[in-house]
Amino acid sequence: MALTPTAVANSALSKRDTVLLTSLQTNYGAINTSPVFETVRRVSGGTIKKVNYTQSGEIVAGYNPQNQVQSGIDLTCAFETEASKQTIKYLIEALYAEDTSYTNTASTFASLVNGFTVPAATYAALSAGDGFWVNGFANTLISGFYFVASKSGGTTIATTIAPVATEAAGASVTIKSNKHLNSNDPYYRTFQTATTDLSTVSDVSRHTVYDAIPNTGSVSIPEEGAVTGSFEYMAEREVSGYEAIAGQTVTAAPTDLVVSAVDGVKAFYVNGLSATCIMKSMDVSISLAQAGDNAAACGKRYSRGTPEFTGSAVLRALRDAPFTWRNYAHGGTRVSVACRMSHGGADETVIVFTRCVVTEATPDLDADIVTTSASFSAELDPTLGYSVGVFTNWTV
């Protein structure tokens, strides 16, 4: 006899009954016409409306409580993720990043003892400090990621880490460098929290906010487990009621792999050189200090304050040079810090803090295995012209 499922008229709500949707706005001040939403891959979080009150000064007779007067409304969307391409996209938005994409395929690339010979167009497209990927050399070990150290002669690019071998031009080689550098390009989003609610006509209750601008963003690389992200957007407007937007549709959620600290984090770099197996973990944070501007009969508007780009790391203290980071901190030495992550297949992301002051680096000399806990704060690199960059070989 076939099993017949039990009918349940009113089961308890689960976290799986809620989805967070988002759509990047074409124009400030308006939700896109017939918006196409993407599901936010999240661990927790959603849209929040907080109505603030202040106590009235009017005296109420009879020893009753004083009235509460509405003093403001805060609209936010905060969520936590396990790192994916989507996480990287939100981090780029938190940087107000300027976006430049470059790809070239040619047979005139050559591998040198300290870098590459490249076509004139590639030479012009890349700058010192840029990250790029090459693929297609006959010696497959040459393929991979590199930082530009310097340029010379119109066709020669020196790299911070030399290729493993030299190879003359001839193979069809592809170079990719999609640059996302902190700048002044705003990214406003619409967010919608949609939750099962059988009391509504559509069986779904939706809270939609828009003109939402990033306020904070972070990525955390642990020693093991999943890389995670955390983001907060400040919204200026909301949709009245709890129904869907006219014509809205939802695309399938992205399916790229969550980045693992074990096999998804590929490398750490300090000053463009490998720090893999020295750096154990790393956190990076973006804070934009969005300040709310209130006005009577009008919703709150937000404007960026002074941004802070900070991070921390835990490092092994090896006997041949256990106090490198302590010396950075004591000497005020500026360093660049970066990590490289894989999203599965050939798709990778590199996050770079170009010029950092090491604000603290304390070795735990009482431990059986000594490590150094370090903190750093980014500042403008006057040579490169930016503070934080995200490089990808895939299209954001």
Language model feature labels by segment:
Residues 2-396:
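Signature of extracytoplasmic/envelope-associated structural regions
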